[in-house]
Regions:
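Bacterial N-terminal signal peptides that target proteins for export
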Residues: 1-7
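A short, polar/charged loop/turn motif at coil->beta-strand junctions and beta-hairpin connectors
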Residues: 7, 39-41, 95
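Bacterial N-terminal signal peptides
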Residues: 8-16
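A structural "domain/chain start" motif
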Residues: 16-73, 173-179
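Surface-exposed short loop/turn segments
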Residues: 22-28, 86-136, 142-151
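Short secondary-structure boundary motifs at beta->alpha junctions and helix caps
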Residues: 58-71, 130-178
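Sec/Tat-exported extracytoplasmic proteins
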Residues: 75, 79-87, 107-110, 168, ...
């Protein structure tokens, strides 16, 4: 009897973080205004599915916040929309080059911004441009989004994703490799 009781307590404690997690509906759409023109790139380009290397629930944004779908899918969508916004015509097969992404970490902090308590979400995503059987270019994008705490985790995630896109499309070396 004691063994059952102990196992039940361990089971409940082990799944308690999942029960207290807050689910966030993420309806991300890139609405930024980067001025990078990808319409004249000379190679066919594909974005591979983003991999999540954090080793936790794939829907985890950070701390106790879960998205309705895996964070890797949300980041994929952000990269796709950001490149399309610049006129890139992305392909699904027979590509000359592909972009591979890997989520390294996500961290949520509460910070003071000029007397305003704010949420700061940082998502680190390693991105590599592959072509001709090798890595041509790679970097780690630091998507840091900071918003007043009242705006919530959804707004912090949107700001973080916008920053991921800006860092990618404004990287001179990335742009050079696509020409």
């Amino acid at each position: 009897m004691k063994l059952r009781y102990v196992l039940a307590v361990i089971f409940c404690l082990g799944f308690n973080p999942l029960m207290s997690a807050e689910e966030v509906i993420v309806d991300y759409s890139y609405n930024g205004n980067h001025n990078t023109d990808f319409s004249s790139i000379s190679v066919s380009l594909k974005i591979e599915n983003v991999i999540d290397d954090r080793g936790s629930d794939p829907r985890l944004i950070a701390d106790e916040y879960l998205a309705e779908k895996p964070l890797s899918e949300i980041i994929y969508t952000a990269l796709f929309q950001g490149l399309e916004h610049g006129g890139a015509e992305l392909v699904t097969s027979d590509q000359d080059m592909q972009i591979q992404g890997r989520i390294v970490s996500s961290e949520l902090r509460t910070v003071d911004r000029s007397g305003v308590e704010s949420l700061q979400l940082t998502i680190r995503t390693q991105v590599a441009l592959q072509g001709r059987g090798r890595t041509i270019w790679e970097t780690t994008l630091f998507g840091r989004g900071t918003v007043p705490i009242e705006e919530g985790i959804g707004a912090a995630l949107t700001a973080s994703l916008d920053r991921v896109v800006r860092e990618l499309v404004n990287d001179d070396y990335f742009i050079i490799e696509l020409q």
